[in-house]
Amino acid sequence: MTESKSEGTAVAAPTPEEVRQMYDDFTDPFARIWGENLHFGYWEDAGADVSVDDATDRLTDEMIALLDVRSGDRVLDVGCGIGKPAVRLATARDVRVTGISISRPQVNQANARATAAGLANRVTFSYADAMDLPFEDASFDAVWALESLHHMPDRGRALREMARVLRPGGTVAIADFVLLAPVEGAKKEAVDAFRAGGGVLSLGGIDEYESDVRQAELVVTSTVDISAQARPSLVKTAEAFENARSQVEPFMGAEGLDRMIATFRGLAEVPEAGYVLIGARKP
């Protein structure tokens, strides 16, 4: 375990290797129960009858709109999951997408998805570390990180790498967790449980996030707090795994499953737990 800092307090957090192992082991059961978008959803109205699949696609669409790409552009997807957002982006905007992940099983599934969609000629995925990208300078027209940068032990370094491989004038889109205000007591315990259980190595306020983006020599063009739209994901995740208990217990064990469900339900009671979309460009 490493130390990860949030609001000045050191807490136990998984190592990068533990994050990789988590995705190697947990991607398949999570995708079966939550869906093939391995990220939060976007609900315009928390009470609306909108499925998880539709809500997670909606969040992908918000990122597509934020990215501002043109037909033929080359896009880097940092933390590609099993490829559904990248395929949706490529289809919607007629772009070429290169996705990366530190999970080889995810990369294999993502490439299979691109092939099945008939997009293997312009959507590809590979094993790579976001903090040491294996690409030339200025080799992409756009970069996005959809709910992945919180896994980085050094978010600033990852952002600098994203900026390095982006051409001048290129755009960046980020979706990620933030803390809207400092937390203490039971709220801090809930946040710390999420950090430890969710592989969260970088978590802080919106101002801190924007500062990291600017220090990567990128210009912040928009910041949208979508905490209210993303928050239903917490309870819905807990409900989905509770309803699938018989499928998950053999893999996670009863204690591990109970801990996961409690973590998501606990974080749902923390209004300071937020979610943000950040747009940027390279001068």
UniProtKB/Swiss-Prot annotation:
Resulting phenotype, residue 151 to A? Reduces enzyme activity by 80%. Strongly reduced affinity for S-adenosyl-L-methionine. Loss of enzyme activity
Residues with site note (Important for catalysis):
150
InterPro entries, per the entry: Erg6_SMT_methyltransf (IPR050447), MeTfrase_dom (IPR020803), Methyltransf_11 (IPR013216), SAM-dependent_MTases_sf (IPR029063)
Report the enzyme's class at the first EC level: transferase
**Functional pH dependence:** Optimum pH is 6.5-8.
> EC number(s) on record?
2.1.1.164
Recorded catalytic reaction(s): these are: 4'-demethylrebeccamycin + S-adenosyl-L-methionine = rebeccamycin + S-adenosyl-L-homocysteine + H(+)
Quick one: a GO biological-process term for this protein? methylation
The record's keywords, sorted A to Z, are: Methyltransferase, S-adenosyl-L-methionine, Transferase
Q: Name one GO molecular function term.
A: S-adenosylmethionine-dependent methyltransferase activity
Q: Which residues bind S-adenosyl-L-methionine?
A: 101, 106, 129-130, 146, 151
Matching entries from PANTHER family are given as: GERANYL DIPHOSPHATE 2-C-METHYLTRANSFERASE, ZGC:194242
Give the record's family classification: Belongs to the methyltransferase superfamily.
Q: Give the multimer and partner information.
A: Monomer.
Tell me, what does this protein do in biology? Glycosyl O-methyltransferase that catalyzes the final step in the biosynthesis of rebeccamycin, an indolocarbazole alkaloid that inhibits topoisomerase 1. Has broad substrate specificity and functions as glycosyl O-methyltransferase on a number of rebeccamycin analogs.
Which protein are we looking at? Demethylrebeccamycin-D-glucose O-methyltransferase
What organism is the protein native to?
A: Lentzea aerocolonigenes
